[in-house]
């Protein structure tokens, strides 16, 4: 799932009544909102600078301050963003724990949209933690919630379910789910999810020993991700293209895609991604 945009701060109204509110509480509330805005701005600035560690801390701080002024939407958005950044850092357990602010707190009136986003994010994190059973549970919860909304997340949910099918050795099911996801994404002009679906289609075909048929959707995914300038997705596309080319017997193409993937990974300073990619490419 993509990082969510920072939400606008809610303006808290003063209490009703004929007497003027005490100055100190009003000042405290104003200070809290200022600190909240500052934390969100610092998180965004650190993200742009590539300081993921600092951004994760600031998203957590923004969520904490939002809780003190009962800005539940901001609690959710910052917790979800913190989870995304932790996962980019390879800290999957902390990515899961960040979502507890939303998923483990039934008292706060989070919107259906925020709960769905958190459930989807948890499914993605559980996949990284190699827990496809839990991932399937949260993906199904998100799918049920999606049915109650004018749902913009249908393609994302189908892609997550396709990934779960791949992790469960059900490549044929994964290919069908990814095809449905690609169709839904195209209908909404959601190019990022369309690329995700095409990449999953390609991987599913490769795992069904159809590597030549895998190349076209993977090339389409790469073209979209290059247009979107998404380096992490480009790395995933190049890795899959190297694997599919090797399986199809085209060693020169496989080597070219591999070398390009290494270049992208090193530019990202993504040591975890580089290690995972090299491990995949060493497999027979």
Model regions: which residues?
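N-terminal leader/linker segments that initiate helical-solenoid repeat arrays
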Residues: 16-64, 68-77, 81
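Short coil/turn linkers that connect adjacent helices within long alpha-helical scaffolds
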Residues: 28-30, 67-71, 108-111, 147-151, ...
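Residue register of alpha-helical TPR repeats
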Residues: 37-38, 77, 117, 156-157, ...
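Eukaryotic all-alpha helical interaction scaffolds
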Residues: 59, 66-67, 86, 106-107, ...
């Amino acid at each position: 799932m993509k990082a969510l945009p920072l939400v606008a701060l809610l303006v808290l109204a003063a209490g009703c009544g004929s007497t003027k509110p005490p100055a100190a509480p009003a000042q405290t509330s104003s200070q809290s909102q200022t600190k909240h805005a500052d934390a969100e701005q610092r998180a965004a600035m650190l993200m742009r600078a590539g300081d993921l560690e600092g951004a994760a801390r600031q998203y957590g701080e923004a969520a904490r301050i939002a809780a003190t002024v009962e800005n539940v939407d901001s609690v959710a958005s910052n917790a979800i963003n913190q989870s995304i950044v932790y996962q980019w850092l390879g800290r999957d357990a902390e990515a899961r724990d960040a979502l507890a602010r939303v998923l483990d707190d039934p008292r706060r009136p989070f919107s259906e949209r925020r709960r769905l986003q958190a459930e989807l994010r948890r499914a993605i994190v559980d996949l990284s933690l190699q827990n496809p059973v839990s991932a399937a549970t949260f993906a199904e919860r998100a799918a049920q919630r999606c049915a109650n909304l004018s749902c913009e997340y249908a393609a994302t949910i189908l892609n997550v379910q396709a990934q779960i099918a791949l992790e469960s050795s059900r490549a044929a099911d994964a290919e069908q789910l990814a095809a449905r996801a690609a169709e839904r994404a195209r209908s909404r002009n959601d190019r990022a999810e369309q690329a995700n679906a095409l990449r999953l289609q390609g991987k599913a075909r490769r795992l069904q020993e159809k590597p030549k048929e895998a190349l076209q959707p993977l090339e389409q995914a790469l073209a979209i991700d290059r247009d979107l300038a998404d380096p992490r997705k480009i790395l995933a596309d190049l890795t899959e293209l190297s694997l599919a080319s090797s399986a199809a017997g085209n060693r020169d193409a496989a080597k070219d895609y591999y070398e390009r993937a290494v270049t992208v990974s090193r530019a990202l300073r993504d040591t975890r991604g580089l290690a995972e990619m090299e491990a995949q490419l060493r497999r027979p």
